[in-house]
Structures are given as C-alpha cells and as structure tokens.
Amino acid sequence: MTITLGKRVLLTKEKIDKISYSLYLFVLVFAPPIVPYPHLFLTIFSFLMLVTTYKRKVWIVLKRSGIYNWVLAMGLLAMYTVCVPLPISMLCNDIVNTSHYISVINRYGVLIVAVSVCVTYLLCKTDRDGYGYEFLLESLINAGVIEGVCAALAFLFPGVKSIFIFFMKQFSASNLYSNTWYITVRSYGFASTLVDVFGLGAALIAGICFFYGITRKKIYMAESIVIAIATILNSRTGLLVYLISIVLSLLYVLQKGDIRKIISTFIAIGLLIIAGSKILDIMSTNEYTAGWFQAGIKSIQNFMSGNRTSNTSGDAMSMLFQDNFWKFPTFPRIIFGTGHSLYGAEGYAHSDVGYVNEIWLFGILGCLLLYGKIIEMCGMMKKSTRIPVFDYAAVFLLISYFFFNIKGAALGYNPGAVVMFFIIFVGTYQATSYE
C-alpha cells in the first residue's frame, strides 16, 4: 500500500510497515500502559498469527534464531528449581510467602513466553515482507526514539507527565507511581516500569544506535542522543551502560583501522559531549532531578576514592555495597539454591543485587546454566555473523548484562531483557539464514 497526494508519494509500503513494526516493538519493549498488560494482548495476537498465517515458518525460525534452544534451557532451569532447591527448602523449613513464588514465576515466565512468541512472529513477518536485519534494527531504534521523546516531553511539560503518571498508576503493577518522591524526582517517560531496568533497555538501544550510526547511517548518531534522554532522566546505571557502548564503539573502529570511521567516531563523541552538557543544563532547571543526578555522581566519586558513608539512605553506592545486600546462602545451599530470592521474600533482608538474588534462587549450579546460556548465545552470534553491528552487539550485550546485574536483576520481563534477547535472536537468525 502506498499513500499519495496527487502525483506525490507521501508514504511508501516500506515506510508504513516501518511505522507498524516500530509501534509493535515500542509496546513489546516498554509495555506503555495505555491498557492493563499491553504486552499480553501483543503476545496473544502474535500467537494467533503464528498458528494461522505463519504455521509453516514457525519451526524454521525457532531453530535458526536460537529461540528454541533458549526456551529449552530456561525450561530445564525451571525443572531443576522445582526438583532440587524447593524440596531442600521444604526439608529446611524455609518456604517463604506464596506471593514471592508467584512473582518469580511471573518474572521469568512472562519474559520467556512474550519474547519467544513475539520475536518469532516478527522474524516470520519480516521474511514474508522481504525485509532484512536493518529494517528490524531501525524499527527497534524508532521504538527507543519514541520513548526518548516521551521522556523529554514529560520533563519539559508537567501536564504531559501528569497524563503519563495517570495511566501508569492506573494500569501498571508498580506501586512507585504512588510514591511522591519518585514521581517528583524521576518517572519521565511512558512505560510499565521506569526504574533501572528501563534505563538498561533504553541504554542498550541507544548504544546499538550509536554504533549503527558510525558504521552505517550517520543520522542514527543523533537519534542515539534522543534515546539516551530516557535513561539520563530515569537511570544513572543506564547512563553508565550508554557510556560503555561509546567506549566499545571507539575500540571497535580503532581495531578495524578504518580512518574515516575513526574520525567519524571522534566527531560523534565530541557532539555527544556538547549535547550532553546542554541536556544537563536543561536538567538543572528542575532542582529535584538535578539533585538526584548529582548525588549519584558524588556517590560514585566517594566510592572510587574509598570514602564510604554509614548513611546508606542518601548514598547509592554505599547502599548497593552494604553487607545485607551481599548475603549469600550457607553451604551447601549456596551450591543448589533455595528456590527463592531475597527480593520480596518475607523473613529475609532485602537485596537488589542480581547475582545475590539469582544464587539464592538457583544456586551456583543453576546460575552456571543461566549465565552460561547467555554467554553461549552471544558467543554464537559473534562467531557466526558477518555484520559489524551484531559482532559489536555480542560484546556490548554481555558486558552490559553482567555489569548491570551488580545493581539489580537484569532478567525478567523488562525493557533491558527484552532488548537483549531481541538483538541476540535477530542477530543469530540473520547469520544462520546465510549458511
């Protein structure tokens, strides 16, 4: 379908398709709560399309993309958890509140179902429509740009933020939108969650976008800045992930030795510094958000210089590295796991740290399977691909995942995990399709 005005072509079929793909990915990644659980509707729609329109293609896509093997690995991890850590916890009289187990099942179950179904559908549809990996990556970037614009509008116009907060409070499961401090200092954007995992997702898209800009299409270097606004306003950890992407991009082009791309990268970094300073100037107009951002910078500086404070409530790094946050199960349960984490488990001190929660949940044995599978998938993508952006993404995603897991659990249905697996499966599929 093409939309014209007289003899002038306004929108080609490809542009119309890119709009629809971009909106689809915006809902899949960020789950903007226009209605309750929008990702659920998306998953049901995608499943119905797979069993009707694409039923002959599904198995090929599942195998070539690596989705099938990932689902098997996660299923094996679930069986291990039910058969080993949980019975041991029953014998030790260490069964926690039922709501915690439900949240764990929801955390991993929704991620596996939504990502496997929706990414399979997108790959099937992309093949049928005759588009390649660039089309999907650019659609993902567009989804990030939409979120970046939403974040900027929410910061600049309080009325827009109030509308977003209304929907997020009504139709998302997070209680944070009833927290006066949180909605005053942060919560800029429109998504089911705007905490650190949101910042991780936005930073991953912005990082891929930056590299794509210096290696393929220059306009994406500018779009990278727009996407980064979402993480700057909501997640200091996400900003660090974005900085990692810039360093890795520079190292990548230096290693390849392409003078033109090296020059382009340094120019892009210079423009980023200028744009970043302007964004910080605008942020300073809101004393609460600016104060929160500056407190994070000061916390990192104090930590690096060894000046830890006993007042963890106002110091992010001191809170993160307090003893309670790094308490592991005793031997031998540290090996096998307990079947529950510390996040929301009654009778246990809370911890945000991803590694700590996952070792409590799965034990060292389960974590070897969990982390090993992620390393294997990224390694396979890097080994098999001939496309620079996926070669770069394999390293960037791995470093970002293991770095972020210090701050919080990266896995679960959230923007960070969805973006990571989307890129891995698209990258693996395009590589195996050319074999």
Question: What are the residue ranges of the model-derived segments?
Answer:
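Hydrophobic transmembrane helix bundles of membrane-integrated enzymes that assemble
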Residues: 2-288, 349-435
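Generic alpha-helical secondary structure signal
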Residues: 130-134, 291, 315, 319
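Rossmann-like dinucleotide/flavin-binding elements
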Residues: 292-296
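Long extracytoplasmic/lumenal interhelical loops at the membrane interface
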Residues: 300-362
